């Protein structure tokens, strides 16, 4: 009986309690420190912190010229908004305007990044609870329905409940939001068979979790089978552990399911996740990314005269 109770306790526990803070919490901590160092007029320390943040999010390079020239296709990564804001922040710190303007403009960019990299809702300002999960899994889905589970920390048992729900009621599901749910590679592995069987699922949001490149590879393998994820158009893997771009095979697999969209860019880069693959982004991204450009513009200069 003791062993059964132990297994039950482990199933009900959060996904990775011993793994420390989620990646997005570390990134937000750096951003807040950048804000404080700028208030203290310590721009060099702010630049050091920004370098850590860029590398952690997959945008390598120690100098502004590295960012803008080597990574000119940053808008074609998994998370174009974050990368766009990071480049703007780097430009602010390396090519400052007047002293009193530096803190104001850089602080605004930091606040935008913090908002984008953390769970947020226009309707609810409190953290979602397990009761939110229970109520979400009790409703009957209508045609074109969205299930929003974002911000609810999921345990292995929660994932089992979600799988059963999708197996029995997910036929009309179009968008599934699992962002900021503490989802790990292991939990996604448990959930995948229920996900790839959904006949109408077009958007899968997995950003802000604990997923690694192994999860991206597993999704890539699943996408190769056209019987799985029959109409999936987009997967958001941004703001995870080390997934800074979609593997080229995954993007190609998504393109096959959207054959009517012939303008999806496939830009090859050297920092791919799979041999022969590359960084790429699709214009069919989730609408929360706004009107991010689908083509990189001309390469900006390393610094500009103010």
UniProtKB/Swiss-Prot annotation:
Segments carrying the region annotation (Disordered) are 1-22
Q: What is the induction comment?
A: Markedly decreased during differentiation.
What Gene3D superfamilies does the record tag this protein with?
Ribonuclease Inhibitor
Report the InterPro entries cross-referenced here: LRR_dom_sf
Q: The organism sits in which domain of life?
A: Eukaryota
Stretches of Low complexity bias are at 12-22
LRR repeat locations? 173-186, 198-211
UniProt keywords (A-Z) are: Leucine-rich repeat, Repeat
Q: SUPFAM superfamilies recorded for this chain? A: RNI-like
Q: What does this protein do?
A: May suppress myogenic differentiation by modulating MYOG expression and Erk1/2 signaling.
Of which family is this protein a member? Belongs to the LRRC75 family.
Protein's recorded name: Leucine-rich repeat-containing protein 75B
What species is given as this protein's source? Answer: Mus musculus
Q: Which gene encodes it?
A: Lrrc75b
């Amino acid at each position: 009986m003791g062993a059964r109770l132990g297994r039950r306790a482990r199933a009900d526990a959060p996904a990775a309690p011993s793994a420390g803070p989620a990646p997005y919490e570390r990134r937000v901590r750096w951003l807040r420190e950048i804000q404080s160092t700028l208030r203290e007029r310590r721009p060099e320390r702010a630049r050091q912190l920004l370098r850590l943040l860029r590398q952690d999010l997959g945008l390598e390079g120690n100098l502004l010229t590295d960012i803008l020239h080597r990574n000119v296709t940053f808008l074609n990564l998994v998370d174009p908004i974050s990368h766009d804001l990071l480049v703007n922040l780097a430009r602010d710190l390396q090519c400052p305007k007047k002293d009193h303007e530096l803190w104001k403009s850089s602080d605004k960019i930091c606040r935008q990044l913090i908002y984008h990299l953390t769970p947020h809702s226009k309707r609810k300002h409190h953290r979602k609870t397990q009761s939110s999960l229970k109520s979400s899994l009790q409703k009957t889905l209508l045609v074109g329905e969205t299930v929003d589970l974002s911000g609810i920390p999921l345990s292995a048992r929660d994932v089992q409940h979600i799988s059963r729900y999708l197996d029995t009621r997910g036929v009309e599901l179009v968008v599934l939001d699992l962002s900021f749910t503490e989802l790990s590679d292991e939990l996604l592995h448990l959930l995948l068979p229920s996900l790839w069987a959904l006949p109408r699922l077009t958007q899968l949001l997995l950003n802000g979790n604990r997923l690694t490149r192994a999860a991206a590879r597993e999704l890539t393998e699943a996408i190769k089978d056209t019987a799985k994820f029959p109409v999936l158009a987009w997967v958001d893997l941004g703001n995870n552990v080390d997934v800074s771009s979609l593997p080229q095979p995954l993007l190609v697999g998504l393109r096959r399911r959207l054959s009517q969209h012939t303008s999806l860019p496939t830009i090859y880069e050297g920092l791919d996740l799979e041999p022969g693959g590359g960084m790429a982004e699709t214009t069919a991204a989730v609408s929360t990314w706004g009107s991010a450009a689908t083509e990189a513009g001309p390469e900006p200069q390393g610094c500009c005269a103010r």
